[in-house]
Amino acid sequence: MNKFAIFLLGCLCLAGAVSGQSLEQTTEQRLKDFFANYETSYARIGKCGLERFEVEHEKKVLRVYASPTFGYQPFTEENVSAIYRLLKQSLPGPVNYYTLQVYADGKLIEDLVPNAYRKKQDKTRLYGKLDAKGNPWVTNVSRPYEISRGLEGRHIALWQSHGKVYRNERNEWRWQRPRLFCTTEDLFTQSFVVPYLIPMLENAGAVVFTPRERDWQRHEVIVDNNTCTKGSHYLEVEDKKYRWQDTDKPGFAQKYQQYPDNYNPFTDGTARFIPTQGQPEKAFAEWIPDIPEKGKYAVYVSYQTLPESVSDAKYLVFHNGGVTEFKVNQQMGGGTWVYLGTFEFDKGRNDYGMVVLSNESSQKGVVCADAVRFGGGMGNIVRGGQVSGVPRYLEGARYWAQWAGMPYPVYSKSEGKNDYTDDINARSLTVNYLSGGSVYNPTEEGLKVPFEMTLGLHSDAGFKTDDELVGSLGIYTTDFNDGKLNSGVSRYASRDLTDMVLTGLQRDISSRFGVQWARRSMWNRNYSETRLPAVPSMILELLSHQNFADMKWGHNPDFKFTVGRSVYKSVLKFLSTMHGTDYVVQPLPVNHFAIREGKKKNTFTLNWNPVEDVMEPTAKPQGYIVYTRIGYGGFNNGVYVRKPEYTVKVEPGLTYSFKVTAVNRGGESFPSEILSAYKAKRSKGTLLIVNGFDATSGPAEVNSALLQGFDLKADPGIPDGQTPAYCGYQQGFNRDKAGLETGDGLGVSDDVLEGRLIAGNTRDYVFVHGKAIQRAGRYSFVSCSDETLESGSTDLTHYDMVDLICGADAKTFSTSMREALAGYCRQGGRLLVSGSKWGENLQKDDFGKNVLKCTYGGRFSNLSSVPVKGAGTSFRIQGGANESIYAVPSMECVMPVEGAYSAFAYTNGNYGSGTVYCGEDYRTFVLGFPLECVENTDVRTYLMQTIVQTLLSKKRR
């Protein structure tokens, strides 16, 4: 080859190298530009970037590795296709024709699409045929319906973030998070998990465990063969053939009222066992508690798992509503507290308040009996020379684990040196110990309970100064144990769970409230609660407890319900995907509930309507459960009916109360409001009680240019039932102090409400009014929801008197409600109206003046619980947050029009609180305060008697 040819070849090679280098640089710049400018409407993930890229020109492959933030977003098959398309369009030729592979979070982005949302599933992160065999840990045998497409047989562990812990370095008990916006995370997350998420999962058939105490009952009664709470009694009845004996394993005994660190009460006593029989009631053990105060108590049993233990130990819980039967699989979970359910018990020791364990079984073996616990109780673990001083449900998981018999390394890896980190680790390690030896955790030793996922619900820090939402964040961990869970399943199953929960929340919250809920990132990071569990796990940072815009929603009970239902649905769909099974979503609660007198003598007929869930096509009812309560007792186990109607025969002289749930193959809805009815023995007529009090709400909001927060003193709101969420009253309202967590920082709150259960709407006030009517005279009564009145399905003319409960609901007097009441009055009706917050509605179309015969005189402050006087008596209505009845911070001033007169007044008589109209055409009695909030039963009865006599007497007053 001549010199020129060699030179020319060299030039060509140099040009090719320069051209290749230019292509690489252009590709790199285009990739950097793409990721730097990348935004997604799916989530707020922050700035993305390019980590590196690889080009194989020979194979025509371009591999792109995005920064971690790019993996924080949710991936679907649709947005993955869009990313590839847009990225290719931005690349130079010929690279834009190469096979493109985009990596994030350690995988191709198409592999990050959750299995539930993709056509070709990743089997490495599915359980597939891996499943627990045999009976669940606990089964409610008395449940009157079957669940076949819910979470039946599934065992789920979840927890409500932090609790009070002993801080070793400070030598004091402290919350783990600051007091902000009237709460602290340690209290706040309880109000989502315990009243909403746990029951929804259980209603779907799941066995739910939480490593923190779930029962808000301060009292605790222990009944045991070794030691009993004073007044309680343990009894054994033996068969001629079989006798109770001590087990070789130790059992529970409560030797002390308070316990030091590293002391296990489940090794201080004995446990008892007896061989099983096929015939019922041959031999049994009884635990009869001496209940200190009437109320609801969680019931926990305990036993030891023995080589011959059976999986169907028969427990009977006798409570105020009857008897509920459970089957407990004693082949797992021995040596700890096992939750059966929460029931209502009367004060004292009663033969209808106890737990019985029978030796009846379908299996040959033994049943074991140890202590039974009633109620959550107070914290009893001593740290630094003192107990926490709060109910056990407010303490961290570390202390519950010790009381529950967990080994010391489970709840104190630090050997007592750092309770804070021990508490964080104890949540996961407790679940691992319980599940050790099960199909989902075969590599660890433990109690063989087949838990298959965990979820920790937290709230986060972070704030915005422009009333913008911070929103929800999810956390999971894949970089541990070679990327596998203890069952061998890929840890990316945890990402699937995280993605599905966040996707569900964004969809459900946005749809329910018409607000674009903020979805944040999915972090693949090294957190104890997602690293340590042997099963798929996630942390849900639901919202920011430091941000006012988030907490406006966080304090809203309807929001709490929506969050609970959304997370439940995501868990249902996740586990159904993991096992390849179909699912059905449990229905929504029914509405339009009404009780009418039946066609036959001494019967009542109940009617209601199902509620469609537009978000979930499978959530259709297939039947209903009607629960009954007689008098002051508890609700029974319910009766299944196929249609939305039920007729019940009653005994005159007794008050019957009912609540209804909807059921399908996926489970059971939350209950309806509670309605009541009564048939007098010699009835003079029938009255109708209308429940117009549906409302729940958060506390009063303050949001101006300078001030922001929640004013619990002005109005603590209306919790759903009751809530432990409030720590105290907000002290710092200065918007300029946002981000400061002490001193005068925005949201900083005091501690005066800590440990108190603030009362809200029980949805059971028809019973309160009804009992007053029952005592007032020989009148029968039935009841209905306000929806039935508004829809025209209830004919008011059938009733001698109508009692409308407005409670503290500002929306009671809708247009259709006003029309129905006006029509009733025009036909000679007798109407009682009581409540607060509704006064402004009187001015609409002169309804107050023309129908109720009163005018609105404004609101009267009741923050100091001022006296109300009238009808020869005086009483007070609770104005502030308290534990006995929902607060009424302001009451309505009502003034009579011509022809009517004042019957009640506030304080000195200058502010009218009740009016009476006794015309020739009809009669009304209007109260500017809720009658049910008159707490003294005798006074309330006297007031109702006065009202009934006034409205129904033949003489005109």
Which residues are covered by each model-predicted region?
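Pro/Thr/Ser/Gly-rich low-complexity, intrinsically disordered linker/stalk tracts
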Residues: 574-618, 667-685
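Aromatic-Pro/Gly-enriched surface loop or interdomain linker
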Residues: 196-204, 212, 384, 674-800, ...
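A glycine-rich, often tryptophan-bearing local segment used as a flexible ligand/cofactor-contacting loop or short
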Residues: 795, 804-902, 907-908
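Non-catalytic propeptide/linker segments at domain boundaries
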Residues: 65-67, 72-174, 369-390, 394, ...
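Active-site-adjacent mobile loop/cap segments within catalytic or ligand-binding domains
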Residues: 263, 270, 275, 354, ...
